[in-house]
Structures are given as structure tokens and as C-alpha cells.
Amino acid sequence: MSAIPLNRILPLGFLLIFSFISLSSCMEFVEDPNNQGGLNLQQRLGNQWAVGHLMGKKSLQDTDFEEMESFAKRNVENMKAESERELRHAQLVVRNILEQYLKNMQN
């Protein structure tokens, strides 16, 4: 009599158990046609997949970005000027920090 190792039986057993669990959860509920309960709600509302993140959104085609005042026209010169301003500001901050550090070191 040959013994089957337990490590070969367990994966097959788990596969069978989980396949039966998934089948039982996928079965549809049979309901009374006169009952307008919550089980039939999905069929009345239609497909609700990926609707929540679209609520309250407008189409981008409806928005004219060029006419909106809140969007400044961005070109290379404007972006370069902004980056130079940010760089100067960062250099000023670092310079102030170093000056404070040197003052504290001398005291």
C-alpha cells in the first residue's frame, strides 16, 4: 500500500474547497417577481461599474482653456522666468540660513 504525501493532497484539497466557495458566492438569488426588494436593485439601476469617480465631472471638451482667465498662457519664456525666480528665491533662503549659522558659530 503506497501512501500519498500530504503535501500533494493539501493543494488539491484547497483548490476544490475554494472553487466550491467561489461557485456558491456567484449563484444568483431566486426571488419573488412581485417582491421589489433590494436584491433586484442592480437590475433596475443598470450597469453601475466605474460611475462613482465620474460624478460631478464635466467633459474637457466643454471647457475652453484658452478663454479662461484662471489659466495663464504658458510658454517657454514664462516657464524659464518662473524657474529662475524660484532658483533665486531658493538661493536667498540658503544664503540666509548660512548667515544665521555663521553668526551662531561666532557667538
Curated annotation (Swiss-Prot):
Cleaved signal peptide residues = 1-26
Propeptide part(s) removed at maturation, as residue ranges: 27-41, 56-107
Instruction: Give the tissue specificity.
Output: Expressed by the skin glands.
Q: Which GO terms describe its biological process?
A: defense response; neuropeptide signaling pathway; positive regulation of smooth muscle contraction; regulation of insulin secretion
* Cellular component, GO, one term: extracellular region
Principal localisation: secreted
Give the UniProt keywords, A-Z: Amidation, Amphibian defense peptide, Cleavage on pair of basic residues, Pyrrolidone carboxylic acid, Secreted, Signal
Give the intrachain disulfide bonds.
none
The reply to whether Cell inner membrane figures as a keyword in the UniProt entry is no
User: Which Pfam family name is an example for this entry?
Assistant: Bombesin
Report if keyword Lipoprotein is assigned: no
| Positions where Methionine amide occurs in the chain | 55
Q: Which GO terms describe its molecular function?
A: hormone activity
Which residue positions does Pyrrolidone carboxylic acid occur at? Answer: 42
Report the protein's function.
Stimulates smooth muscle contraction. Role in induction of hypothermia, stimulation of DNA replication and release of many gastrointestinal hormones. Possesses insulin-releasing activity.
Q: Which family would the database say this protein is a member of? A: Belongs to the bombesin/neuromedin-B/ranatensin family.
Protein's name according to its UniProt entry: Bombesin
What species does this protein belong to? Bombina variegata (Yellow-bellied toad)
